[in-house]
Every structure is written in structure tokens, then in C-alpha cells.
Amino acid sequence: MNICIIPARGGSKRIPRKNIKLFCGKPMIEWAITAAQSADIFERIFVSTDDAEIKETVLSLGVEAPFKRPEHLSDDFATTIDVMAHAVSTLGLDNESTVCCLYATAPFLQPEKLAIGPEKLNHADFAISVTSYAFPIQRALRVKSLDQIEMINPEQILTRSQDLEECFHDAGQFYWAKASSWVTRKSIFDGKVAGIPLPRSRVQDIDTPEDWELAEVMFRTLGLG
């Protein structure tokens, strides 16, 4: 059984009410819910929230919010693993259920990429969305002071960029695992992790008002709205 759980707390600080703030004409979380529904792989879609308005919004979109997330899992220090472990346990999911944690702030999500997750779990404990760095991280600089910078990897200074290893980072959109892994693992990297690569054009952090404005420009440019 494939289950989707979308964490969506009400107390975002840098962008107030971020999860239901209108993004290109719709509540932010609606884009993620629509993508999950369009993937056509989930038997049930749940939202884990502490907020009555978010609950009302998601119920109107045809997903379930059968429990209230505890206060101690709704602050700035709660981890994804802790939130998911609570949701999986509260829902009483079977250990072998395949569970996707889908972030509410994923308006660029491609349903076909989301659907790759269950297959990846045949050979991994977790499968997560990733995207490549736009520039070689081996050329990263450390700021020692206002008057001094230095290479973090000076041994790479003469290496051609095309010879440097391509590196990836967490795309911050979705995470797949068996229900048992969500409950017993200490982090998403506790075990074997598979990556599901996404195009850089479909990935954007949305943590500040500036991020939000840029994301809306990208979204409209891609013709997604």
C-alpha cells in the first residue's frame, strides 16, 4: 500500500501562513496535493497539521487530516523524522506500507518523478528527491575575514571543471520509506539512500519572501500556473 503524508504546520515564521498562502492563485499546499493525486499511486493521502485552517483547506481538496499534530512536533525544532514517526504510528500503518513524506511547499513537483519512489525502495531504505549543484562544489570558497578568502579544496584549483565529480543536494520535495523505517530510523540518511534526480529548473527553496517571489517568477516562466 502506498501512503502519502504531507506535513503542514501552521506556525511558519519567515513566511507567515506559508503552507496555505496563495501561490500563483492557489494555496501553496494545493499544488503538492494535486501532484500527489495526479501521480495516481496513492491509496490514501493524509496531512499532518496542528492548524484548523490548514485542516479545513486540505479537507476541501479531498485529502484526510484525521489527527491533530502535537504542539511539541509543530515548532521550529521538530524534525521530519519525528513528525513522520508520529503520523505513521498514529495512523497505525503496517510496517511494510510504503510511505511518502511530501513537503507542502513543492509547487514544482512532477508527478512522474514522485511515482519512481516505490521501485527505488526495492534496493534502499530511503529514496529522496535530489538535484545537481549548478556550480562545482569543489571550487567553493571559505570567507576567513572581510579581507581574506580561501578555497575549501585547494587541491582542485588546477582540475578542469568537466573533470570534477558532479554533486547533488536534497531537493526538499519528497522522501520515500517503508513505515517501519520512518518509526525506527534516526534520520533520512540512517541506512541506504537512493536518489531521484530532478531538473534544477524544477527545484527552488521557499524559505524567505525573496525565495517566494523568485519561485512565482519561475513557476509562471515554466507555464505551470
Named regions from a protein language model:
Residues 1-48:
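N-terminal glycine-rich phosphate-binding loop and ensuing alpha1 helix
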Residues 41, 61-63, 145:
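Short, structured coil segments at secondary-structure junctions
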Residues 42, 93-96, 123-125, 224:
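Short, high-confidence coil segments that cap the C-terminus of an alpha-helix
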Residues 48-49, 176, 206:
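Short beta-strand scaffold positions
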Residues 82, 107-191, 197:
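Conserved core of the sugar-phosphate nucleotidyltransferase
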Residues 195-197, 202-225:
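Hydrophobic helical membrane-anchoring modules
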